[in-house]
Regions:
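Surface-exposed, low-complexity/disordered segments
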Residues: 29-33, 48, 103-108, 117-183, ...
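Periplasmic plug
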Residues: 647-686, 705-716
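Short aromatic-centered micro-motifs
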Residues: 46, 76, 189, 226, ...
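Contiguous segments within soluble domain cores/interaction surfaces
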Residues: 19-36, 41, 47-48, 52-89, ...
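Structural motif
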Residues: 42, 191, 279, 652-654, ...
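Bacterial Sec-dependent N-terminal signal peptides
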Residues: 1-27, 360
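Ligand-binding face of N-terminal immunoglobulin V-set domains in extracellular IgSF glycoproteins
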Residues: 52, 96-102
């Protein structure tokens, strides 16, 4: 038995030659196969129609949060692959959050949530996460039930992919089903020529897998008979026994990954065989066997992953760089690198609607937390999936795995995980394709945030290499003017848009010889450059089926509680609306007077004034070129005379009136160029104290909007960019209210607290705070965080 580490050291001093086929394949892998995956956390595993679905997304590049993408599309589909709703989510350090408001009339069925970055569309759709979400509706004519079908199939996988005569071989037996797998099952291995005498027997580790080891004989045909707990059985064939080849045996422990190679009837034994270990698309380990030997072993240290957990793919290549064996194994399966939250204080009560709090340490390396607090019903049902299984397992496989979270729980069976990985193959790349030089086609490159191209058309023609002005107004903020020059195709571009408020875009072209307005016959279209892509894959099978509902449809307690929570929310919201209406009716103040008080200050306030209100009244101003044109004939004693520049100048009592824009002295040309839709109020002062005769123009502030109901002809040069979807706010409030209109008889909330971004501030402890419902006696608290080095904090505790 030879030590490959020693052989590796000797091979390292050999002269550097031209790249071999394998070395080129490794370079190809490193440069072209970087890929992302998504884990999606939802606040509940099932919903009632009308619920709000809260979600938090984590995007990974390998086992670290991804820096590749800043945009995530999250889509909701029904069972017929019809798109119901979708969100564009802003990613910060690979994390983003949002919510779906489920409609009350959604039919009861299984829905699917798809989440992907634009960059992920370059690769197989099967790697885009599809989350199964059952939604219940008491008014639906059909009901979701768990299928009792026992339709499953089995397959046996030899370790390394080879089955060599005379060498002990480990097998994994894997069950699969479109619905549910049997709770437990057993099996036996037989020689087809002597079926009554089992060679070995085995029991399932879980619903997914089992394993056994046999030493095959040349010329023998072996079969496996599997029987589940209901009595159903199936017989499958093992692969044909080979007389020559290579056997790979792997054992993973906290010290590292030990592997053994055994050759049988090879021409040059294992000489010039190569062992390659990859983690995602990165080379982590490489060794060469330079001596004649039929058996070799070595220990791969955990430092290849810096001590982190993850999947290592071992691939064995012969002297001609042909792939002869491969195997997946987990690094440090019994020693998961998971941090726990540092809780420095808690105030937990069990009385209905009481206030509870949990304080986290402000001195931790972890600064931003995702926190979910739910009522725990005490059933102690294990999680089916979580961020651990998404990061280390299901995010990289397209096959269906039953309850993957079990492999990373406190009671996890490392043998079961190993058997599962024997039955899996790494499909994010194919070694034979790599060796042939195949490179994926990258049609969508990752880019920062959202981008748009703007196409102006004036008098029916594209504006090529033309200076234009873009006026950008974000939400309720003041507009900003930006100068652009269109390219040779007539486009201007807006890049790096990372807002979650609507962005108003208006484009203006410099007029020629002052003969034509910059917006006359000008049309503008805005086209997004970062777009969702139609789903081409297939939804996974589920354990649910639809049956015709009976006359008295029964609902589970959790769904009944969810529906009652919706009723409570509506009651409170309706009461708030009624109270607000009463306030508005009781106020009875003159809106014009209120606007004047809001905008006018000091010496500009005068009783002797004429006010035109454009915020609360429709002044039909849209057809006017400027405010001076509109004012003509509307105020007694106010006249206009055209100056040398052709601008109308206001006069009061045959004297030129002073002009003020937002109470700052200005000239007529400035006022004449002001867009009329930006004007909130015009005030005419006659003999007002220190000011005298004056015309005061006030522009829109904050959330003011023009009352004009007329269609504005100038809007052809404008468009609105939606940007990212802004997450709703999860309200933290008590339903314990003495107001009869808001009185809630039974608080049945399941989700008591949801915060996708809890963080500390100036060394103040991050505080988890929530109000109890009427029934909870204990709470399930989930805390997730990553530090700057992407170390994972995952803590789920029950507080009693």
């Amino acid at each position: 038995m030879k030590n490959i580490v020693f052989v590796l050291l000797i091979s390292m001093v050999q002269p550097v030659l031209a790249q071999t086929k394998l070395e080129k394949a490794l370079t190809n892998l490193e440069n072209n196969y970087e890929q992302e995956k998504v884990y999606l956390l939802t606040d509940k595993s099932q919903y009632a129609a009308g619920d709000k679905m809260w979600f938090k997304s984590f995007v990974f590049d390998g086992y670290n949060r991804s820096a590749l993408s800043t945009t995530l599309f999250v889509e909701l589909y029904n069972a017929d692959k019809k798109l119901i709703d979708w969100k564009t989510i802003l990613l910060t350090n690979g994390e983003g959050s949002g919510d779906f408001q489920l409609k009350e009339d959604l039919p009861e069925q299984v829905y699917f949530v798809r989440a992907y970055t634009p960059y992920m569309t370059n690769f197989n759709d099967d790697f885009q996460i599809v989350k199964t979400i059952p939604v219940y509706n008491p008014n639906s004519k059909e009901s979701l039930v768990i299928s009792k079908s026992s339709d499953w199939s089995a397959k046996a996988f030899p370790e390394g992919g080879t089955f060599i005569s005379g060498i002990p071989s480990k097998f994994a037996v894997r069950l699969s089903s479109k619905t549910s797998l049997p709770e437990n099952w057993t099996g036996k291995v037989i020689d087809s020529q002597n079926p009554n005498v089992p060679i070995t027997t085995f029991k399932s580790f879980d619903r997914n897998v089992a394993s056994f080891t046999i030493t095959p004989a040349s010329g023998k045909k072996y079969q496996v008979i599997i029987q589940d707990n209901t009595g159903k059985n199936q017989t499958i064939d093992l692969p044909q026994v080979a007389d020559s080849g290579l056997n790979l045996q792997v054992y993973s422990s906290k010290e590292g990954i030990k592997y053994t190679l055994k050759g049988a009837n090879l021409k040059q034994q294992l000489q010039n065989y190569k062992i390659v270990g990859t983690i995602n698309n990165h080379l982590a380990y490489k060794a060469n066997i330079n001596q004649l030997t039929n058996e070799a072993t070595s220990l791969i240290p955990t430092k290849i992953s810096n001590g982190a957990n993850g999947i290592l793919q071992l691939a064995i290549f012969d002297e001609q760089d042909n792939l002869v064996a491969q195997r997946l194994c987990f690094i440090k399966p019994g020693n998961l690198k998971i941090e726990k939250a540092e809780i420095i204080g808690q105030n937990i009560k069990h009385t209905p609607r009481s206030f509870n709090s949990i304080d986290l340490s402000p001195e931790s390396y972890f600064k931003n937390y995702t926190v979910l607090v739910s009522e725990d019903d005490g059933t102690q049902n294990p999680e089916e999936e979580n961020i651990l299984s998404g990061l280390w397992l299901t995010g990289d496989f397209t096959t269906k795995i039953d309850s993957p979270a079990q492999y990373f729980s406190k009671s996890a069976n490392t043998e079961a995980l190993d058997a599962l990985l024997i039955s899996e193959s790494w499909q994010r790349f194919d070694w034979n394709s790599l060796l042939s030089g195949s490179v994926p086609t990258i049609k969508t490159n990752s880019q920062p945030y959202l981008s748009y191209k703007i196409k102006p058309i004036k008098n029916g023609s594209m504006l090529i290499n033309t200076p234009v002005s873009l006026v950008l107004r974000l939400g309720k903020n003041e507009p900003a003017i930006n100068q652009f020059i269109t390219d040779q195709n007539g486009y201007a571009y807006l890049n790096n848009i990372n807002y979650d408020e609507p962005l108003d875009v208006s484009l203006f072209v410099n007029s020629e010889n002052n003969k034509e307005s910059g917006t006359d016959n000008l049309f503008v279209t805005v086209e997004p450059l970062v777009n969702p892509v139609a789903f081409k894959g297939n939804f996974p099978g589920t354990k649910y089926k639809l049956v015709k509902a009976g006359e008295n449809k029964t609902l589970s307690p959790s769904i009944s509680r969810a529906i009652n929570t919706q009723k409570n929310t509506k009651k409170v919201e309706n009461a708030d609306v009624q109270i607000e209406e009463v306030k508005l009716v009781g106020k009875k103040q003159d809106p014009k007077e209120e606007l004047d008080k809001q905008l006018s200050t000091g010496m500009f306030s005068s009783v002797n004034s004429t006010i035109f209100d454009f915020v609360n009244e429709d002044q039909h101003i849209a057809g006017s070129n400027n405010i001076f044109d509109w004012l003509q004939g509307r105020a007694a004693g106010l006249t206009f005379q055209r100056n040398n520049s052709g601008v109308n100048v206001p006069y009061i009592r045959n004297q030129q009136a002073k002009l003020y824009l937002d109470e700052t002295a200005t000239d007529p040309s400035m006022i004449a160029s002001l867009p009329v839709n930006n004007i909130a109020m015009v005030k005419i002062l006659k003999g007002a104290g220190l000011i005298g005769d004056a015309v005061l123009i006030y522009t829109m502030k904050g959330n003011m909007r023009s009352k004009s109901n007329e269609k504005e002809t100038q809007k052809n040069n404008s468009s609105v960019i939606k940007g990212y979807d802004k997450p709703s706010e999860f309200l933290i409030e008590t339903l314990d209210n003495d107001d009869p209109a808001k009185k809630i008889e039974n608080d049945t909330r399941e989700t008591l607290y949801w915060n996708p971004n809890l963080f500390d501030s100036d060394y103040v402890p991050p505080r988890i705070k929530f109000f109890n419902n009427d029934s909870a006696k204990q709470y399930k608290v989930l805390i997730i965080s990553f530090d700057e080095d992407d170390n994972l904090l995952y803590d789920q505790e029950i507080f009693k």
